[in-house]
UniProtKB/Swiss-Prot annotation:
InterPro entries, sorted: C2H2-ZF_domain, SCAN_dom, SCAN_sf, Znf_C2H2_sf, Znf_C2H2_type
Cross-link (Glycyl lysine isopeptide (Lys-Gly) (interchain with G-Cter in SUMO2)): K20, K25, K196
Compositional bias segments (type: Basic and acidic residues): 203-230
Name of this protein: Zinc finger and SCAN domain-containing protein 12
GN (gene name): ZSCAN12
Region feature (Disordered): 154-175, 198-264
Zinc finger motifs (C2H2-type), residue ranges: 274-296, 302-324, 330-352, 358-380, 386-408, 414-436, 442-463, 469-491, 497-519, 525-547, 553-575, 581-603
SUPFAM superfamilies: beta-beta-alpha zinc fingers, Retrovirus capsid dimerization domain-like
UniProt GO MF annotations: DNA-binding transcription factor activity, RNA polymerase II-specific; RNA polymerase II cis-regulatory region sequence-specific DNA binding; zinc ion binding
Disulfide feature: none
Family: Belongs to the krueppel C2H2-type zinc-finger protein family.
Native source organism of the sequence: Homo sapiens
Amino acid sequence: MASTWAIQAHMDQDEPLEVKIEEEKYTTRQDWDLRKNNTHSREVFRQYFRQFCYQETSGPREALSRLRELCHQWLRPETHTKEQILELLVLEQFLTILPEELQAWVQEQHPESGEEVVTVLEDLERELDEPGEQVSVHTGEQEMFLQETVRLRKEGEPSMSLQSMKAQPKYESPELESQQEQVLDVETGNEYGNLKQEVSEEMEPHGKTSSKFENDMSKSARCGETREPEEITEEPSACSREDKQPTCDENGVSLTENSDHTEHQRICPGEESYGCDDCGKAFSQHSHLIEHQRIHTGDRPYKCEECGKAFRGRTVLIRHKIIHTGEKPYKCNECGKAFGRWSALNQHQRLHTGEKHYHCNDCGKAFSQKAGLFHHIKIHTRDKPYQCTQCNKSFSRRSILTQHQGVHTGAKPYECNECGKAFVYNSSLVSHQEIHHKEKCYQCKECGKSFSQSGLIQHQRIHTGEKPYKCDVCEKAFIQRTSLTEHQRIHTGERPYKCDKCGKAFTQRSVLTEHQRIHTGERPYKCDECGNAFRGITSLIQHQRIHTGEKPYQCDECGKAFRQRSDLSKHQRIHNRRGTYVCKECGKSFRQNSALTQHQTIHKGEKSVSV
């Protein structure tokens, strides 16, 4: 049968669409009261325009006329400016070139411009870079269903996919849509996904018609095609009870319970839906529309009494309050660790089970979290959008760029709570902390202290006096190689660590970090006894000896002890017959530099008198 049909009535008119197949007329009961500013109606006409087939017309003139009409209904030049039309075309292409892993997620946000897409993607990138509990809520009974839905999402594109759009109408029940949005939250860990699920459980417009109309279009166009029961549930008896289930009066869709029947009839195109005047989105319940409209008005009526933060929905406020109460009701049966959200527990349990649901299509590598897959994909695409302005090195993640910039600035944001040592990278801090937490099984026979194997070897050199690392210039020896490297900079004059504020350079990174606190005024090391604060950990240790009375530096000549090494060095010059500091004018020697400086003023005075 040749499917030559023509649009008899424009969509602008308050008449239903008439479709002509051969000599018979079929009037679809699809709700064609699509407002001109409705985003979803524009999407329908865009798909008609893109999927239009030449064979559906009687000749080239009719084909051109039909294409013009569909394009007019999509772009609407009578209401849109040239800039708005260009933006629609750019948006369409932008969505098309996105990776498949991102397309479905971005389209869930219903962006209306390219800038909105960029904002959504940048927000996602920031959330993936920030550690923390991912947000999602779904019950344990849904777990098996959600796993199946994840599989279905991986096997095919969503109904609004721009890469592989098919002209086949699709209908999804509100239960299925809600559960799929929950799966999306698990995959991305996106806070907005939960807000959308809890506050504005929006319904996609139903009954999207295809470009080819079948004979039974008047029936199927109202609600679209439905999935068979066995596709969305694992219950084997679902098909056998099909004849006993209630059905929709409009299209014969089988429903499991009377409550489903009532809910289904509410969302059927034959029933009135609640549409948003601002963006055109439709909802099955008036309460959902009211909550959705708060996105446009900015109204946040639910306020936290603890911190004053406001939210659009009550359920989001309830979840937020867990932060203040510290409640962690979800506990892991394997290790006993507790979590504030079920989704965080679910992801944690994959560490014990070894489950990895997210697979890379290029190399097959699997990941337990969606965030891990997103970052891995950039290896194949070689996408490194974040560039360092100092050395032009590029990175795939903003967080890695931020850490890298610490190499140039000398910033060390990751500090050990045990010893105060700071690091540029968080991974370096984690490795360092293992020194404190690791079981120390190797004990020193001299003093009884315990160390790791390598730590014990270095420690024993204190007792044996062994210094295997020797300077080639001055032959000074050191216990550790790092100490030798830092010492050699005295001879080479190398000062690789430079202060951005004053330009002063240093041989050691730790000295630069302590110096920078002069500019910032930061004094992170505080004495528990008197409350005095210090810039460096060594200054605090020396100060604490005032309270403890400890004097670890002892003179070998007379046995006198001192708190600081510098005080011992000054004292030892008393025993040395020759003075350390010699005046270049007269050759006189002094034990202290301050005495030499004071002496040199005499020569300066003599020179001024003679002049």
